[in-house]
UniProtKB/Swiss-Prot annotation:
Residues with the FMN phosphoryl threonine modification: 248
Keywords: Cell inner membrane, Cell membrane, Flavoprotein, FMN, Ion transport, Membrane, NAD, Phosphoprotein, Sodium, Sodium transport, Translocase, Transmembrane, Transmembrane helix, Transport, Ubiquinone
Catalysis: reaction(s): a ubiquinone + n Na(+)(in) + NADH + H(+) = a ubiquinol + n Na(+)(out) + NAD(+)
Organism of origin: Chlamydia felis (strain Fe/C-56) (Chlamydophila felis)
Domain of life: Bacteria
HAMAP family: NqrB (MF_00426)
Root EC class: translocase
Name of this protein: Na(+)-translocating NADH-quinone reductase subunit B
Record function comment: NQR complex catalyzes the reduction of ubiquinone-1 to ubiquinol by two successive reactions, coupled with the transport of Na(+) ions from the cytoplasm to the periplasm. NqrA to NqrE are probably involved in the second step, the conversion of ubisemiquinone to ubiquinol.
Length: 503
């Protein structure tokens, strides 16, 4: 029956007035069966894995990230949109798989989570494939060449890079830009310099920044989530400092001014976690002993929130730590990120129980995809490993250099430089970009040496943009696109080096 359907399409396209739609019939035939094209010149190689099946393997590798996107967006939407402060408290105090499963089964429900997630992700996926496919078909008909299989991967990668609240018309505009401008104008699949999915996201990021950053990470209706958070904070008596919010790790990092120093964060952490020793303990204790002369009977790890704020924001001459009062909430928030407190724990970051772009939240899901791509030989492990090494070493160097230059364990260096290097690998879209974006075979280098340099460069630029550039909370997208631009140059020098060695 399927073969009869395909043959009927071919018969229609053989008529004179429908011959221009031959690429459509060819694409349907190739998708349902196998390519009908034969090589016209040597070498003649028979291989069961054609481009279509190669693309399908990448889609299979994306299954864990896709399921994670559906599941996590559903959970976050139900919790943040509930208006129930007790439900939010229970969610934020989850510790371990047993408590997480208990919360899901008893408080929200599995089917409710899946349905809420599907309502968020499925429309974006349909828009991506529909609009992107229409652009592919249009150019194939105009140019009279076959429709390439590249959209199979781009169509699912693109919605995974978006926030769940993105308006549908913006999602359509972004995929159209990615397919047309970054791919078709360069000649189509295999000829593009930049990654189409990332190009579409970059277009939206610079054209509509308010819809791509800020409070856009939960549900599908930002206003509903905002009203729900206000109601929960009011019910629980939360302040702006310790209230519920949908801020991400990177948004918290990006909104922390350089005037928030490591000593401020350590002082807050020693009080929250009741730690008897933090890296800058000597500086804190020295100042605290002066401050307690006018506040007798207080202990550093047993201060109330008001007392802690008073100590941290008092002038240095009075025994305080000299932080501006208006920046205490930023220091309090970045403490959670640096020390992995509450919703920003390393477990939540690794497994994906956080807010963020749809496909970037779960590092574990990305690692499953990475293993599949490496085992099947689809993606380059060299690019992945070098990307991770570049990011880790750069983050570690920021910390070490700050300590060496400032002294006193970096007490008066910006706090943002002291996020543990391994946690940088879990933040934002680094894992997703490392596995699925940086390894794009078309826009990345082909030579082994070039792949190592390419990955190191992207990892370095990712952390540099995160920690230095206040305009962009995430550096992965810009770093990979910049790496795409330099990929041909890296290949050129790698080939020259190889030729010299051969001679």
């Amino acid at each position: 029956m399927l073969k009869r359907f395909v043959n009927s399409i071919w018969e229609i396209c053989q008529k004179d007035k429908f011959q221009r739609f031959t690429p459509v019939a060819d694409a349907i035939d190739t998708f349902c069966y196998e390519p009908i094209h034969k090589s016209s010149s040597p070498p003649f190689i028979r291989d069961a894995v054609d481009v279509k099946r190669w693309m399908i393997l990448v889609v299979v590798a994306l299954f864990p990230a896709t399921f994670s996107a559906i599941w996590n967006s559903g959970v976050q939407s139900l919790v943040y949109g509930s208006g129930n402060a007790q439900l939010m408290e229970a969610f934020l105090h989850i510790s371990g798989f047993r408590s997480y499963l208990s919360f899901i089964f008893h408080d929200v429900g599995v089917f409710s989570v899946l349905w809420a997630g599907y309502k968020i992700f499925l429309p974006l996926l349909i828009i991506s494939y529909s609009v992107g496919g229409a652009c592919e078909v249009l150019f194939a008909v105009i140019r009279k060449h076959k429709i390439a299989e590249g959209l199979l991967v781009t169509g699912i990668l693109y919605p995974l890079t978006l926030p769940p609240t993105i308006p549908y018309w913006m999602a359509a505009l972004g995929i159209a830009f990615g397919v047309v401008v970054s791919k078709e104008l360069f000649g189509g699949t295999g000829m593009n310099i930049l990654n189409p999915a990332l190009s579409g996201r970059a277009f939206l990021f610079f054209s509509f920044p308010a819809k791509m950053s800020g409070d856009v990470w939960v549900g599908s209706n930002p206003m509903k989530i905002k009203e729900s958070l206000l109601a929960m904070n009011s019910t629980a008596g939360k302040s702006i400092i310790d209230g519920f919010s949908q801020s991400t790790c990177l948004h918290t990092l990006n909104s922390t001014p350089p005037s928030v120093k490591r000593v401020h964060v350590d002082a807050i952490a020693s009080n929250i976690l009741h730690m008897t020793h933090v890296p800058t303990q000597n500086v804190i204790q020295s100042q605290f002993s002066i401050w307690t002369e006018s506040h007798p009977g207080l202990m550093l790890d047993k201060l109330t929130l008001e007392q802690l704020q008073s100590f941290v924001t008092s002038p240095l001459s009075e025994g305080g730590l000299g932080l501006l009062p208006t920046q205490f909430d930023s220091a309090y928030a970045i403490t959670d990120v640096i020390y992995g407190i509450g919703k920003f724990s390393s477990g939540n970051l690794f497994w994906g129980n956080i807010v963020g772009s749809l496909g970037e939240t779960s590092t574990f899901a990305c690692l499953l995809g990475a293993i599949f791509l490496i085992v099947t030989g689809i993606a380059s492990w060299r690019t992945m490993v070098s990307f991770g090494i570049g990011a880790f070493v750069t983050a570690w160097l920021f910390k070490i250099v700050s300590i060496l230059i400032v002294g006193k364990h970096g007490a008066w260096a910006p706090a943002r430089f002291f996020i543990p290097a391994y946690r940088q690998l879990f933040l934002g879209g680094l894992a997703f970009g490392l596995v699925f974006m940086a390894t794009d075979p078309v826009s990345s280098p082909t030579m082994k040496l070039a792949k190592w340099i390419y990955g190191l460069f992207i990892g370095f630029m990712t952390i540099l943009i995160r920690l230095i550039n206040p305009a962009y909370p995430e550096g992965v997208m810009l770093a990979i696109l910049l790496g795409n631009v330099f990929a041909p140059l890296l290949d050129y020098f790698a080939v020259r080096k190889y030729r010299r060695r051969r001679i």
